[in-house]
């Protein structure tokens, strides 16, 4: 069996990265930004300032990553003739962003607001019904085109979310090791690469 690693096309991390968003997206004229109501006032003004040369449409997430929500956002993307979809928020916002990018055939940029989710880098969206019960996994052909992590945003998130992210980073090493030594199949239907295992080691080392 072959070995394969999946990763975003570009990963960028640093303090005040939201201020650089205009440079990251300078090749696009029309942009849709998906975020939640509780994050709108916190982040949209910064993003609007950074994207002042672009035409931006803000879409407020309606509480669930469901097919009806994905279709609603996709319709807005198509109606505004937007060229790229940006997701700002937690796991469900980012999963919705990834699914919309897939169905609308548009590049996506994800900006996580907490360390407690794997959604930013994965090639997977977890889809629910509108009543919040599980529907299905949507396996995507690739990870996001860009992941932008503003460390100031992550640091300002609720402490419980940072703790959860640290715990997840710590446990990833043991999960990766079990898969690596047993030659188990990963979500890409291949075996774990040495580089992926090395990243999991670095994750553990950074939080110990």
Regions found by a protein language model. Give the residues of each.
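ATP/NTP phosphate-donor binding region
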Residues: 1-84
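A short, small-residue-rich loop immediately preceding and capping a beta-strand
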Residues: 77-115
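Alpha-helical scaffold segments in soluble metabolic enzymes
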Residues: 20-24, 46, 72, 99, ...
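Conserved small/polar residues in nucleotide/adenosyl-binding loops
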Residues: 205-208
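A glycine/threonine-rich phosphate-anchoring loop and its flanking beta-alpha core
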Residues: 104-202
């Amino acid at each position: 069996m072959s070995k394969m690693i999946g990763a975003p096309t570009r990963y960028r991390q640093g303090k005040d990265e939201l201020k650089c968003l205009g440079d990251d997206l300078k090749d696009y004229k029309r942009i849709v930004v998906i975020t939640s109501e509780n994050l709108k006032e916190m982040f949209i003004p910064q993003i609007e300032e950074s994207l002042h040369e672009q035409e931006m449409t803000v879409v407020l997430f309606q509480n669930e990553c469901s097919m009806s929500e994905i279709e609603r956002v996709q319709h807005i993307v198509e109606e505004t003739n937007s060229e790229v979809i940006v997701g700002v928020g937690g796991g469900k916002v980012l999963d919705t962003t990834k699914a919309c990018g897939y169905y609308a055939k548009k590049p996506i940029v994800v900006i996580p607001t907490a360390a407690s989710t794997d959604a930013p880098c994965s090639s997977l969206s977890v889809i629910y019904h509108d009543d919040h019960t599980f529907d299905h996994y949507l396996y995507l052909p690739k990870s996001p085109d860009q992941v932008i992590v503003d460390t100031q945003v992550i640091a300002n998130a609720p402490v419980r979310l940072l703790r959860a992210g640290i715990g997840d980073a710590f446990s990833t090493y043991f999960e990766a090791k079990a898969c690596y030594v047993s030659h188990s199949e990963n979500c890409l239907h291949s075996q774990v690469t040495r580089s992926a295992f090395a990243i999991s080691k670095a994750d553990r080392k950074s939080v110990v």
